[in-house]
């Protein structure tokens, strides 16, 4: 069934990201399935190949769900899609027109899925940072980020998995001014797969605006009462994301989930 779903994606034009949601019994099976997905894409897509992520969370009403991100080229503007690698061989896509550049990255995770959440988060964010520096961008250029966290609400040594992730995210995000607000973001739990990050970053002549929801408090100003951590060595970091992000020149709105 997975190959049938993936084959349907090959027929789409300008596919830039594939995200496969499925059930895994443990992290060993997760790594096996992730390797299968990466090898399948390498065999069946020509460059520029889409970035790929495997999310170890069974869909509610199916065994597999494939999320496909593709581009529609505007008739009045040419764009290029190039497959790029960092110095440490982290793969990503660069999309460019005459007035803007967008980075599509996915599947960013630690090499060892058995490390503590904090260490896994640091390794994943270092890969994000490496891509951004390669493109002469910074964290403030990220407009959309997807965060998939194994057992997101588990408590270890008094600290919640999600809070440990937020603390690391806060440290890396501190290097940027965030003049256009934090990214729109997804933060969901998974059964396995460690810490996994996808992101889109944009720079150039584009108008980027953060979006609020009057019915919700902004996540990045949550109070300590809703943040679960007992670390004495660090201040609790809030979830750094906006409820949405508008990239108006691209007629695009990213909604947080």
For the regions a protein language model found, what residue spans apply to each?
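Short, hydrophobic/amphipathic alpha-helical packing segments
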Residues: 2-3, 118-132
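Phosphate/pyrophosphate-binding loops at sites that engage ATP/ADP/AMP, CoA/4′-phosphopantetheine
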Residues: 4-15, 132-141
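Conserved "HGTGT" condensation-loop signature of ketosynthase/thiolase-family condensing enzymes
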Residues: 8, 40-41, 110-112
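Acidic helix-start/capping segments at beta-turn-to-alpha-helix junctions
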Residues: 19-26, 143-151
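Short, conserved loop-to-beta-strand elements that form functional interface hotspots
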Residues: 23, 27-73, 157-202
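Surface-exposed beta-loop interaction hotspot
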Residues: 73-76, 81-84, 190-194, 198-248
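Cyclic-dinucleotide signaling modules
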Residues: 89-105
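Conserved small/polar residues in nucleotide/adenosyl-binding loops
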Residues: 253-257
């Amino acid at each position: 069934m997975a190959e049938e779903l993936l084959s349907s994606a090959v027929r789409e034009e300008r596919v830039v990201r594939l995200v496969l949601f499925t059930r895994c019994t443990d992290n060993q099976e997760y790594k096996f399935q992730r390797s299968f997905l990466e090898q399948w894409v390498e065999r069946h897509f020509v460059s520029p190949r889409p970035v790929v992520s495997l999310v170890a969370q069974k869909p509610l009403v199916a065994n597999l769900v494939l999320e496909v991100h593709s581009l529609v080229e505007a008739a009045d503007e040419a764009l290029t899609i190039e497959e790029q690698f960092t110095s440490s061989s982290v793969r990503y896509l660069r999309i460019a027109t005459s007035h803007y550049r967008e980075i599509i990255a996915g599947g960013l995770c630690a090499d060892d899925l058995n490390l503590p959440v904090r260490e896994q988060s640091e390794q994943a964010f270092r890969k994000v940072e490496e891509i951004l520096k390669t493109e002469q961008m910074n964290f403030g250029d990220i407009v959309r980020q997807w965060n998939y966290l194994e057992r997101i609400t588990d408590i270890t040594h008094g600290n919640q998995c999600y809070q440990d992730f937020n603390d690391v995210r806060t440290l890396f995000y501190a290097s940027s001014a965030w003049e256009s607000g934090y990214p729109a973001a997804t933060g969901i739990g998974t059964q396995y797969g460690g810490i996994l990050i996808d992101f889109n970053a944009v720079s150039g002549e584009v108008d980027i605006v953060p979006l609020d929801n009057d019915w919700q408090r902004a996540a990045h100003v949550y109070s300590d009462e809703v943040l679960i951590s007992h670390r004495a060595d660090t201040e609790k970091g809030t979830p750094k994301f906006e409820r949405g992000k508008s990239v108006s020149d691209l007629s695009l709105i990213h909604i947080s989930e």
